[in-house]
């Protein structure tokens, strides 16, 4: 636990059992390893984090993480979302933390370089309260589905809006469309403020909690990445997609 006391850059993976779309998802097997283990080991490969820990309120997940040698913290069952779970762990266990990265446990193909880029962007941009990655897409299915969040941002990388709709709407002039990747790097002080911001009209309408930040006038900056993530796991059928993606990566490395 000494690492908890001294860590300044912390990665936390909130993990819960009760997903409505895929109950027990963290312990689903992907080519012999569970989803939570793959996500954890990816985060450990980051060059910028001092410590990586799983945050859960489920004993089954806790026991599994400890079994494969990971660090895990039990949180209260009252956390309304993953961000609140992350903030609870940081406030209780990481007194020296300066930067906190909320790493989604359903992105087993996320490159650790994405985490490094978020931390670097936050360190080098005093105006940023938090940073999140985006990637350009031309995939019509991803653009049109409301399961994929799109983002528009200004020339300095400051997010203007996030939406489940296709934004911008290319009515007259073709413009790149960027998908949001659900990983966030916070300054610790702002994370404590963030969880106290009440839901806003836009965040409720889009079901995107980060919109409450924009509605209060605070800043989210983006870090543009390329080929840094593969398929995520939202439904049981996504497991096959992830396995095929990982097998292709393995073959390509030879």
Curated annotation (Swiss-Prot):
Keywords: Cytoplasm, Lipopolysaccharide biosynthesis, Nucleotidyltransferase, Transferase. It is an enzyme of class 2 (transferase). GO terms for molecular function: 3-deoxy-manno-octulosonate cytidylyltransferase activity. It catalyses: 3-deoxy-alpha-D-manno-oct-2-ulosonate + CTP = CMP-3-deoxy-beta-D-manno-octulosonate + diphosphate. Its EC number is 2.7.7.38. It is found in: Cytoplasm. Pfam families: CTP_transf_3. One of its GO terms (biological process) is lipopolysaccharide biosynthetic process. It comes from the Bacteria. Pathway: Nucleotide-sugar biosynthesis; CMP-3-deoxy-D-manno-octulosonate biosynthesis; CMP-3-deoxy-D-manno-octulosonate from 3-deoxy-D-manno-octulosonate and CTP: step 1/1; Bacterial outer membrane biogenesis; lipopolysaccharide biosynthesis. One of its GO terms (cellular component) is cytosol. Activates KDO (a required 8-carbon sugar) for incorporation into bacterial lipopolysaccharide in Gram-negative bacteria. Belongs to the KdsB family. HAMAP family: KdsB. This is 3-deoxy-manno-octulosonate cytidylyltransferase. It comes from Chlamydia trachomatis serovar L2 (strain ATCC VR-902B / DSM 19102 / 434/Bu).
């Amino acid at each position: 636990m000494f690492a908890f006391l001294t860590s300044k850059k912390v990665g936390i993976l909130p993990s819960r059992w009760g997903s409505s779309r895929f109950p027990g998802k963290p312990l689903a097997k992907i080519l012999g390893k569970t989803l939570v283990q793959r996500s954890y080991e990816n985060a450990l490969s980051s060059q910028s984090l001092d410590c990586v820990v799983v945050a859960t309120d489920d004993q089954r997940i806790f026991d599994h993480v400890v079994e494969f040698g990971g660090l895990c913290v039990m949180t209260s069952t009252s956390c309304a979302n993953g961000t609140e779970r992350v903030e609870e762990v940081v406030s209780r266990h990481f007194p020296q933390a300066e930067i906190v990265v909320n790493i989604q446990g359903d992105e087993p193909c996320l490159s650790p370089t994405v985490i490094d880029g978020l931390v670097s962007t936050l360190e080098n941009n005093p105006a940023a309260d938090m940073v999140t990655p985006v990637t350009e897409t031309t995939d019509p299915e991803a653009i049109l589905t409301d399961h994929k969040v799109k983002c528009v941002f200004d020339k300095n990388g400051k997010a203007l809006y996030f939406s489940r709709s296709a934004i911008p709407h290319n009515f007259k002039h073709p413009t790149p469309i960027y998908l949001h990747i659900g990983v966030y790097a916070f300054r610790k002080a702002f994370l404590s403020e963030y969880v106290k911001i009440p839901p806003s009209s836009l965040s409720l309408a889009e079901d995107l909690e980060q919109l409450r930040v924009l509605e209060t006038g605070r800043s989210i900056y983006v870090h543009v990445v390329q080929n840094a993530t593969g398929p995520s796991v939202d439904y049981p059928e996504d497991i096959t997609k992830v396995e095929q993606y990982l097998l292709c990566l393995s073959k390509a490395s030879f």
